[in-house]
Amino acid sequence: MIKDRAIQYFMSGYSCSECIVQACIDEGICDECLLPCATTFSGGMSSGCSCGSVTGSQMILGYLFGRANKFGNKISAREKAAEFVEEFKKRNKVTCCRILSAGFSGSERKNHCVKFVSDACEILEEMMKVKV
């Protein structure tokens, strides 16, 4: 289960995007080369925009369902990405890091944002259950 691992990584210092990618690496879902890419996706793409939990999850969806679809089916990565955002917004209203993080910093921010990491992992895990 990636959620528990991702939360562990997040609380130990990984960023929101990194913790999701690292948990997926640990589970054999994606290649370790994605972790350095995830670094700049945190903090709203380093600019306060899209939540790193969302963008880290999008990286995994792209890896699995992109041009070289790992499942060998015709599921569209872009459709999966749109579904992910829709579900995340149902749970949290927005995907904007600035709004979600509510001005918190340091350990307060970690404690506040862990919910978004958890939500993203739950959504991602559900979306990875596909029919081949």
PLM ranges: what are they?
Residues 1-27:
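Active-site-proximal helix-loop elements at catalytic-domain edges
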Residues 40-63:
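Glycine/serine-rich anion-binding loops at beta->alpha junctions
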Residues 76-132:
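C-terminal binding/interaction regions
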Residues 27-37, 63-80:
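Phosphate-handling active-site elements
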Residues 16, 51, 97:
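Short cysteine clusters
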Residues 22-40, 91-98:
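Acidic-glycine-rich active-site phosphate/pyrophosphate-binding loop
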Residues 22-26, 59-66, 122-126:
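Short glycine/serine- and small hydrophobic-enriched flexible loop segments
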Residues 1-5, 35-43, 99-102:
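Glycine/charged-rich beta-loop-alpha catalytic/anionic-binding loops adjacent to active sites
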